[in-house]
Amino acid sequence: MALREHEHEDQLSKEGFKHIYVWQDGPDTWYPDHVHPTATAHLIVEGEVTVTIKGKSRTYKAGERCDVPGGTVHSAKMGPQGCRYVVGEM
């Protein structure tokens, strides 16, 4: 059973993430290569997202977590049902 959103938020807070929020993207939303200045964590609640880092792609589904180190160039493409996720930023 996947954690509920508030449980994800609590988990990220305990890990030291300072800015925590829920985000939702529609079907097939695409974020081209970009960088976050600090580490980010994305805990998938519904749907899926494919994240590409250094030419390697991985799809994350509900119940999974994607961590991106600060300063890392990456892109993201939401699945056909979109994606809802809890984000933590340092």
Label each residue range with its predicted role.
Residues 54-71:
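Short acidic-glycine-tyrosine-enriched beta hairpin
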Residues 35-51:
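Short, conserved beta-strand element in jelly-roll/cupin
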Residues 18-36, 70-71:
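Conserved short histidine dyad/triad with adjacent acidic residue
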Residues 9, 30-36, 53, 77-78:
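Short histidine-centered beta-strand/loop micro-motifs
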Residues 70-90:
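Ligand-binding loop in jelly-roll beta-barrel domains
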Residues 27, 37, 56, 72-73, ...:
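A generic "binding-loop/recognition-motif" signal
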